[in-house]
A protein has these predicted regions:
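Interfacial loop at the N-terminal end of multi-pass membrane proteins
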Residues: 2-60, 104-119
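Membrane-embedded alpha-helical transmembrane segments of multi-pass integral membrane proteins
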Residues: 12-19, 60-71, 84-94, 98
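Amphipathic, non-membrane alpha-helical segments in soluble helical-bundle scaffolds
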Residues: 1, 50-53, 76, 80, ...
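A mid-sequence interfacial segment
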Residues: 86-122
Length: 122
């Protein structure tokens, strides 16, 4: 069971890394060429649709982190699970306190500077 939790955690983390790289390298740069009159609608759709993509793997990451804390697999140092949890917490806090407010600003008043800030803080 512990090994399966570790595999699910690894897979969900890899999915999130892939999504983040896609957003950084493809999606956010494309937002810079969206016409201003469409930017608010695009930003709203981005927020709504992104939740469907990132919600499940983020939930799996969170649950499996807790399970790994409770039952560290044999061969894995207990402190690695805590470092992993700390990194996950930092990523989540950056999303909540850096990315989400910038997305809200992008919906309210589309601006190229906000787009650059999204890339820098993601």
């Amino acid at each position: 069971m512990d090994d399966l939790v570790l595999v699910f955690h690894l897979v969900s983390t890899c999915i999130m890394v892939g999504v983040i790289w896609f957003v950084q390298l493809v999606h956010y740069p494309l937002l810079a060429v969206v016409p201003v009159e469409s930017a608010t609608q695009v930003a709203e759709k981005h927020q709504r649709w992104t939740g469907f993509v990132v919600g499940p793997p983020m939930a799996v990451e969170g649950v499996t982190t807790l399970l790994l804390w409770a039952n560290t697999p044999s061969g894995v140092s207990w402190w690695l699970t805590w470092v992993n949890g700390a990194f996950l917490a930092v990523a989540l806090l950056c999303t909540i306190f850096l990315s989400v407010p910038r997305h809200a600003r992008m919906v309210a008043a589309p601006d190229a500077q906000v787009g650059r800030e999204l890339v820098q803080t993601n």
